[in-house]
């Protein structure tokens, strides 16, 4: 058989193969188990040693040429497929880019930052405190007796373990413990708000086991209930961006203030039109609490208030169900973006 003809036939067959399957079939004709070159190599055993050596060298050279042609065609077909795929996946860089949605603050966090901003403008500092608190700071220091119902496990989340002084740990039920903590490390006059997470065993449309609260405290030598009324009314006007707000202070009871009052606000429009709605608890700081701060209650007096940030957010935006703030429903949250 003419070896040069085998090379020519293989090169032609490979070049005409339009896809990988056809190319592999043509490869079998020349290099397969029954291929032309394979048959020639099998026949070398019938030749005498000298002829076998020379013919074997010629056949191996031809085999290398055929394999080279096969490799070249494989690469050419691979290049064609790659170019086709690149063309199909090509990106037109002149097209406008895809917009990415910008994140935004949660509505309760918007209220949190707004409250901080307003109180900073009237001279209040902003402090933070531990969410895992001792029962002494959470209850005892705030004039809550040992048998107070708020101390029961039906109202408070207790934590296994005690602090270094052997006091029971719990998840704070309000931010009020920071009244005593802050006053013990700062000297009067004390003007501070403490926003933060708090926890109670409660869950319905208007209550959550975890909620955010802001505590306010002003301690000095001549602070009166009139100061409380002025500060909180001014805050509400700025928060709701209205000057015609009507506020009333309704007598109430809290163990850590005396006298105590619920702060109500009259709504004139919207779903709450004509209703007085509770906004905050407040009062003048109880002398026992002043004493636990390390201060002389005969010299220092002050007021405190505690407002729910979710409550303020619901009233500002007209949200009826507190649980919407915690369900992570983007359809709801996007309204505040």
Curated annotation (Swiss-Prot):
Statement: the UniProt record of this protein carries the keyword Aminoacyl-tRNA synthetase: yes
Coiled coil regions in record: none
Catalytic activity: tRNA(Phe) + L-phenylalanine + ATP = L-phenylalanyl-tRNA(Phe) + AMP + diphosphate + H(+)
Compartment list: Cytoplasm
Cofactor: Mg(2+)
Gene Ontology CC, one term: cytoplasm
GO molecular function annotations of the record: ATP binding; magnesium ion binding; phenylalanine-tRNA ligase activity; tRNA binding
Cross-referenced InterPro entries: aa-tRNA-synth_II, aa-tRNA-synth_II/BPL/LPL, Phe-tRNA-synth_IIc_asu, Phe-tRNA_ligase_II_N, Phe_tRNA_ligase_alpha1_bac, Phenylalanyl-tRNA_Synthase, tRNA-bd_arm
Cofactor binding mode and count: Binds 2 magnesium ions per tetramer.
Principal location: cytoplasm
This protein's UniProt keywords: Aminoacyl-tRNA synthetase, ATP-binding, Cytoplasm, Ligase, Magnesium, Metal-binding, Nucleotide-binding, Protein biosynthesis
The keyword Flavoprotein appears for this protein: no
Residues that hold Mg(2+) according to the record: 258
Regions crossing the membrane: none
EC number: 6.1.1.20
A Pfam family the protein falls into: Phe_tRNA-synt_N
Record GO biological process: phenylalanyl-tRNA aminoacylation
Subunit structure and binding partners: Tetramer of two alpha and two beta subunits.
Similarity comment text for this entry: Belongs to the class-II aminoacyl-tRNA synthetase family. Phe-tRNA synthetase alpha subunit type 1 subfamily.
The name this protein goes by in its record: Phenylalanine--tRNA ligase alpha subunit
Organism taxonomic ancestry: Bacteria, Pseudomonadati, Pseudomonadota, Betaproteobacteria, Burkholderiales
């Amino acid at each position: 058989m003419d070896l040069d003809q085998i090379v020519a036939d293989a090169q032609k067959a490979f070049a005409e193969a339009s896809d990988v399957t056809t190319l592999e079939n043509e490869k079998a004709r020349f290099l397969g188990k029954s291929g032309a070159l394979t048959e020639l190599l099998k026949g070398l055993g019938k030749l005498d040693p000298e002829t076998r050596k020379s013919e074997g060298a010629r056949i191996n050279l031809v085999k290398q040429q055929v394999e080279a042609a096969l490799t070249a065609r494989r690469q050419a077909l691979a290049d064609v497929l790659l170019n086709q795929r690149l063309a199909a996946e090509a990106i037109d860089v002149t097209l406008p880019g895809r917009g990415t949605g910008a994140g935004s603050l949660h509505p309760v966090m918007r209220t949190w930052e707004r409250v901080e901003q307003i109180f900073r403008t009237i001279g209040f500092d902003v402090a933070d405190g531990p969410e895992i608190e001792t029962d002494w700071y959470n209850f005892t220091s705030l004039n809550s007796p040992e048998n107070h119902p708020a101390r029961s496990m039906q109202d408070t989340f207790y934590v296994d373990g005690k602090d270094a002084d052997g006091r029971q740990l719990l998840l704070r039920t309000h931010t009020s413990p920071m009244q005593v903590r802050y006053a013990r490390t700062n000297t009067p006059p004390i003007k501070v708000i403490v926003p933060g997470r708090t926890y109670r065993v409660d869950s319905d449309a208007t209550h959550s086991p975890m909620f955010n609260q802001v505590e306010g405290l002003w301690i000095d030598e001549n602070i009166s209930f009139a100061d409380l009324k002025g500060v909180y009314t001014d805050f509400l006007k700025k928060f709701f961006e209205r000057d015609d707000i009507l506020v009333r202070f309704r007598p109430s009871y809290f163990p850590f203030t005396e006298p105590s009052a619920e702060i109500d606000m009259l709504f004139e429009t919207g779903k709450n039109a004509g209703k007085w709605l509770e906004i905050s608890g407040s009062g003048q700081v109880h002398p026992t609490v002043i004493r636990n701060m390390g201060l002389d209650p005969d010299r220092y007096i002050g007021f405190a208030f505690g407002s729910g940030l979710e409550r303020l957010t619901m009233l500002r935006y007209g949200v009826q169900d507190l649980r919407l703030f915690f369900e992570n429903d983007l359809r709801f949250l996007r309204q505040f973006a």
